[in-house]
């Protein structure tokens, strides 16, 4: 969902509203958030944080990187992935979105929710919403992709859900080698395990990934985790 103004402008409006109507600041923030299409101010802040994090992560990505964005449902990982694709295309790179979760209409709606018409990038965005998405199909589809192409895969845990597909670890290693060989950037969106407790840790980390099947998490050169507006960006040492 596109904001009508930068977050600091919206917060300024909330402060003015609080003074003018003599209401608590948190109530004013919630009113502004509602006007922007959010249920309360924490969701508005989370949306703004995701937008900023997308630009920061994109600026850090290099050809050959294999990155991961992890969050619980509703905390912005898919929108962040879409925003990174838009950043890549605006920078003149090709982009690709492979999803086992959404239909083409769903993806179009995701782009529209951040104020972007997907048709604007016709010819620059490769989209695959089929059930056949796997490391093998991705590599075949991108065999001629130029260096700098940015790829988002939605999402990690679904890659080997169908039993006829190779093990998750094998697929991720294959995509890692492909990324390095071709100079493309591969980003996985990932679920967080239900055991994650935000009361003891404000933002999940690599230890909180939901991994029904084994995977060496050291494979990721960069990671980003999101939770209620908190963002943690890290590069492998």
Locate each region found by the language model.
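Short, small/acidic-rich helices and loops at N termini and domain boundaries
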Residues: 2-44
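Aromatic/hydrophobic pocket-lining residues that form π-stacking "cages" and hydrophobic walls in ligand
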Residues: 14, 84, 175
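The Walker A/P-loop phosphate-binding site
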Residues: 32-35, 39-117
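Short gly/ser/thr-rich secondary-structure transition/capping motifs
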Residues: 48-52, 132-136, 205-207
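Short, well-ordered alpha-helix to beta-strand connector turns
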Residues: 64, 92, 148, 219-222
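Hydrophobic/aromatic beta-strand patches that form the interior of the parallel beta-sheet core
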Residues: 67, 96-98, 128, 187, ...
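Phosphate-binding/switch region of NTP-binding enzymes
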Residues: 176-237
